[in-house]
Design a protein with these regions (language model features):
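Extreme N-terminal tail/first-helix region
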Residues: 1-12
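DHp/HisKA histidine-phosphotransfer helix
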Residues: 7, 40, 44, 121-122
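Acidic/histidine-rich alpha-helical segments that form the ligand environment
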Residues: 10-17, 21, 25-28, 60-61, ...
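Conserved alpha-helical segments that form or flank metal/cofactor-binding pockets of metalloenzymes
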Residues: 33-73, 136-139
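Conserved small/polar residues in nucleotide/adenosyl-binding loops
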Residues: 140-147
């Protein structure tokens, strides 16, 4: 099934959001580096790389279906520069929640259009986002350890 113009736009929006997530994670890694939290910064850099992999999965899906993937405008990260470790993880969680909601919206749109071809990819992403949010939530439990 060929992608409709509406679904193509929604997939392109998701591609852009995944790339934006990569930039957000990279900015958060810079904040962690500024706090001399090298392990945390490394984890955030790996997350940034993973978001690019996610964007590529969506790009491949669009391309495999004979459509043209198009990256949209990517906003500069709005996360502050003077964040605590807890605030960094809270910002990561907030962005993961934003990505999760966008994936659920894309899932609902493809379902409404009867696009079963997108289901395997989107099922994978729904599972992935559960894991991503759970990890970020676990790190926000640092609050109990902050002085």
């Amino acid at each position: 099934m060929k992608l409709t113009d509406d679904l193509l736009q929604k997939f392109n929006d998701q591609i852009t959001l995944e790339l934006e997530a990569s930039i957000v994670y990279r900015q958060l890694a810079i904040s962690a580096d500024n706090l001399d939290l090298s392990g945390m910064a490394e984890w955030l850099r790996r997350q940034a790389d993973e978001e690019i992999v996610h964007a590529n999965k969506f790009i491949d899906h669009v391309t495999d279906r004979g459509a043209h993937a198009q990256i949209g405008a990517i906003n500069a990260p709005t996360v502050g520069k003077d964040l605590s470790a807890l605030q960094i993880f809270q910002a990561a969680l907030a962005h993961e929640e934003k990505v999760s909601e966008a994936i659920r919206e894309l899932y609902r749109a493809t379902d409404a259009a009867g696009d079963l071809n997108a289901r395997p990819l989107l099922n994978w992403f729904v599972d992935e986002q559960i894991e991503e949010e759970a990890t970020a939530v676990s790190y926000t439990h640092l609050r109990a350890h902050e002085t």
